[in-house]
Amino acid sequence: MAVVKVEFAISGKLVNKPRVDDWNPLAKFYYADEALNAVANELDSFDGRRDPERCSQLVNKLRQAQDRLLHIISEMIQQVFPRESDRACRDYRVKFPEEIMHDNLPGQLWFGAEANVIPVFGCTFSCLTAGSNIIDHEVESEAIRPMARALTKHLDTLRDLLKDQSLRDPTHYSDKVKRSLKHFDHLFAEFELNYVSAMVPVKSVREYDCQLDIAVLFSEALDRAVRLDYLTQDQIDDCDPIVMIAVPRLAIVCGLLYFPEGALNVDANPETLSNMFRSFHSLLVKIRDLLRILNLHELRRVEKALCTGETQVKFGEDSIVETLTVANFHLKTTGKGTGRILEAQNLQPNGSSSSNSSDGGDCDVSSASGSVCHTNTFAYKILSPIRLKDSSESSSIENSSKLDLLIMTHPPDPHRLRARFRSSADLIHRLFVCICGVADQLQTNYPTDLRRVLKMILQPNDVVPISGKTAPNPENEEEMGLEVQEALPLPSLIGVRWVPDSDCEQCTACSAQFTLVRRRHHCRNCGRIFCSRCSANSLPLPELGYDRKVRVCNLCFLYKINPFSPCTGQSNSSQNHSVIAFNSAVTSTAVVLNQVDHERSQDGSQSNESPTATTATTI
């Protein structure tokens, strides 16, 4: 009797098994879990020493299966808990390095928690749940091992619950499943934070606040540049390289002049500065002093030169246009003591510095991209009247420290600062060289931080209000089919509302009735339903989250190929015009396709699902 019950239960599960082409998350989870178990069983019974290449392939396949399974679980969590406040907070990800955040991160974390040996983030990970340690991270391993065990244990329980629920009803989530999903979400978030923090350096709260202050400063500088016509809105929209170069330069001017107590507060402790500008503290102080003695006209000329990127700019008829040399900057002063000579060095376009000798004394200065002490020394050689004679590294450090103390205790006289330069053009050229030297080094020394700050101001996140109510299931239905299941990204990003399958019984374009053979196909661009003949084209839609080619209807295909067709000239204020244009386009497309079908039927070569020539117009 017991054997009969077991056989009946097994047969019941086979009967209730979800369809392969079902697009519900629970149905997708069932087959993804089956694929993961198959790969795991094959890997357990495989001797990796006999065929290491095959073993490596199986490990990669296992990682992909784990990653896909976690993406499906994440899709379930977003569907069951649509409000972000109900899910685990993941704001800590802003502290992670940019190269860490990718789509395969969840799978790598799971694999790293229970696999034997795995290279992730350039390190070798050992089995945490089995008691091994991460190489060179023994203390961190002991701290996160309980989290890894709790995560893997709960994940096994969750997989059993989800698989059982998928056999019962793939469209319903029981209260027990919901509680388990929520608990897993919090466990995985906690493990992710501690695991990544142990492997790679992450930003502290103060460092992240400093980065946000820099982003605000860059944003203010960009806004001011647009108001003063230094940059155009078209350049910003197109992410012109000129914008990428000019914004850091203008931000230095804004931070030192207009926001002295902000992100570039050089009067405070240098340790409070962002890591991006900390090594340039002494040079920033001298740039600030020179900027303060400029009049409004000279300041505009400096900012214009920083935007154009031209080292030789014609500022006026009486300005010096020829290349400046060290001899042009020799200025002898008289007084009680020895005369002081200002030595200036011209900075080449590629950032290298040339050394010159004068009055029998030589002083070699390394490139501006060198160490901090050399950078400070180079700054004083340009902007300070004190002459440096020692060329050794120890002497440079000692002299720089003394000069730092001298400048802080005795603020420079504006009249003396201006008297060191022959003309206004000389002063502007010196400022241009120093500001560009600091800003351009950010791209070399801190490329990741600079890229993230520029991304914040050039590609801000749009806040879209979302209702807290869960959308009904028909609106979340997607097209059936294994080929689409493999092509769509997970979690899928749907930017348009799809027409439910139950609301459409015929093709939107040709009005052909859908049957068992003629299937429904959603256009990824407009969300309407078409037959295969009227949606035989594919295009990538990155603005909707589809980086790879996905199915689009013939109408949207031609619109994407030729967006300047006559229908785009319709007035946006009248919806009737667009509706009439769409209906006429659908009618004309249907007539042409029906004529083609009629001709093929006469030749005896018609097929219900044969693709035809693409005929489309704009929506």
From Swiss-Prot:
Residues 598-619 are annotated as: Disordered. Signal peptide: none annotated. GO terms for molecular function: zinc ion binding. A zinc finger (FYVE-type) spans 501-561. SMART domains: FYVE. InterPro entries: FYVE_LST2, LST-2, Znf_FYVE, Znf_FYVE-rel, Znf_FYVE_PHD, Znf_RING/FYVE/PHD. GO terms for cellular component: early endosome membrane. Residues 603-619 have a biased composition (Polar residues). Zn(2+) 1 binds at C507, C510, C531, C534. Negative regulator of epidermal growth factor receptor (EGFR) signaling. This is Lateral signaling target protein 2 homolog.
